[in-house]
Amino acid sequence: MPTSNQIDTAIKNIPQFFTVDKILKGECLKTKKGNPFCRPGGLCRVYKFQLEDGTVKALRLWTDIISEAKERSIAISDFLQNHPSKYFVNFECIENALLIDGKKYPIVLMDWCDGINMKSYISQCVEANELGKLKDLAHEFYLLTKELDKFGISHGDLHHDNILVQSDGSLRLIDYDSMYVPALKGYKDECMGYNGYQHPTAREKNEFLQPYTDYFSELIIYLTIYLVSEHPELWDVEKVEEAEKELLFKISELDPKTVNQYKDWNVKGLPLLIEWYKRFLSKSDLKDLKPLSFIIELANIYPPVVSPVPEKETVKIDVSSITEKWKS
């Protein structure tokens, strides 16, 4: 695969390195300093790219080998087209679009999201003391995971850089290199994600893409947001921004003993969340974990809204008129 330096060179010299009109007629957008606008990706470089018609896309160029990348991308794209979701963005895989050292490589064009990553959003809310927004974020994340479970899919690499918060508070998932959809059953699990979001032992042992690879990440992310929404003093903005591979807690810091310090806090559902986290740590296989939505509903953190039963209409009968008619 091309190196990061080769890809940076290619994006600055599009006519020399790209072969498809969609890219040749577009342009890579730049930062205020004049550099290509680039987001880091686990196995790729992601550039903000404008097509000829003005549409802004995310141009993803792989820097690491993913086996059967084309087949994976097609399977994921087909699934999302048949199962529309507000949490994912549209994308297309274009074969043989990048030419470097005589070899052709595929590229991916995705809808561009202008949101900020989850960690930055939490920092903004804490600094502005907008705890209500954090509670909304926790609920929105719960709904996101509930939809993943409903579809029987997993993102595979849930972490703060891959979860973008839009201006209205809604969430978008990006970077689908580790994603599982039913058509990818039996494919290798090749991108394990940030250690700070993964089960300390079970994820490393996992061999194939599975619908349950997100379950540990879901719980650690939700637990963090939920705790901070109740106790914002936990969130040290400078400290968490320096920690690139975790959201707030290092997994090693949240062992069964240390996590107990939060159990007695008067926070709805927290003791049960802690108990399930401890159960997760005791497991050695990802298939033995449970989805976040199952645990949240067990804890009754968001009771179902019951619609009021409409009152029955009372029909008044004029008895006197009926009586008069009967007498006559």
Identify the role of each PLM range.
Residues 34-36, 42-89:
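ATP-binding glycine-rich loop module of kinase domains
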Residues 175-180:
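Activation of the activation-loop gatekeeper triad in protein kinase-fold domains
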Residues 202-212:
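Conserved end of the kinase activation segment
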Residues 145-166:
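Catalytic-loop of the protein kinase fold
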Residues 87-133, 186:
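Conserved structural core of kinase catalytic domains
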Residues 1-37, 71-72:
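Juxta-kinase regulatory segment immediately upstream of eukaryotic protein kinase catalytic domains
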Residues 187-202:
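Conserved activation segment of eukaryotic-like protein kinases, specifically the C-terminal portion
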Residues 227-328:
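Helical subdomain adjoining the active site within ATP-dependent kinase catalytic cores
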